[in-house]
Amino acid sequence: MKRNLEVLISALGKDPFELASHMNLECDAVIVNQSNTDRSYDFRTTNGVNVRVHESSDRGVGRSRNAALDKADSKIVLFSDDDIVYRKGYADSILKAFAADPKADVILFNVDVTENRRTYHIDKTTYVHQGSVGRYPAYAAACRLENIRRAGIRFSLLFGGGAKYSNGEDSLFFMDCLRAGLTVKAVPVTIGKEEPRKSTWFNGYNEKFFKDRGVLFHFLYGKYAYIWAVRFVLVKKRKFKYSMKISKAFKLMKAGIKEGQELASKMEGRK
């Protein structure tokens, strides 16, 4: 198998043997499966893929991704979830993209999703900046492992499935990469698809959604969080106009930003 690439899969209550087969893995993988036990074991698929499984009773997608990062031992890692199915040749496509640009630390790829879940589509090669990190999911990203470790970048335990606040751990990861001076690139190469399923965190544009988004925006944008909050409610207003007034949505985001400021201050005080 391609030892230069490893898929880091965050799973929840899955059968690792069935999962590895269903995902069409072409390279080695680490599966962190959140279950009711704590154990580790390895197996090899029928097409020769080496899979290292780590069952864990811990909860939270951030914990899962960090655990997978700790276990990884290849030059390049690809983040993944248990609802991703890869195209034939995806591994070669990823390795070729990194070979073509030795300066790229993180490369984002297309993963097809249903229209109502689409937040991005890469139609030309571009470099990701701080204003666009919120578009991309973690499962779109492959990274040079050594560079990520050298920069000390980890996934937040505050955001995402199983955490106190809703999604955002992937956006923070990419933002931390940029803040560390790493190069994040997006290429128009499709490597797989996401199978439809109910979201683990999105329950509509309710009060929690907007307040959590405010907390996230503080950690993403700092003193510019309020500006980004205004932009967010204006861009999204058509999606929630029948369930909440724009003024209330913005008020909730402001409350979230304030909560984020207080939380960041407490975290800084513990250092």
For each predicted feature, which ranges?
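Non-catalytic, C-terminal membrane-associated alpha-helical segments of glycosyltransferases
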Residues: 204-271
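Conserved nucleotide-sugar donor-binding
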Residues: 73-74, 137-157
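Catalytic beta-strand/loop signature of glycosyltransferases that borders the donor
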Residues: 155-157, 181-193, 205-206
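N-proximal low-complexity "stem/linker" segments adjacent to membrane-targeting elements
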Residues: 1-30
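Acidic donor-binding loop at a coil-to-helix junction in glycosyltransferase catalytic cores
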Residues: 160-172
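Conserved donor NDP-sugar-binding/catalytic core segment of glycosyltransferases
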Residues: 85-121
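Glycine-rich, basic loop-to-helix element that forms the pyrophosphate-binding segment
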Residues: 55-72
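Short aromatic/hydrophobic "clamp" motif used to bind/position activated sugar donors
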Residues: 77
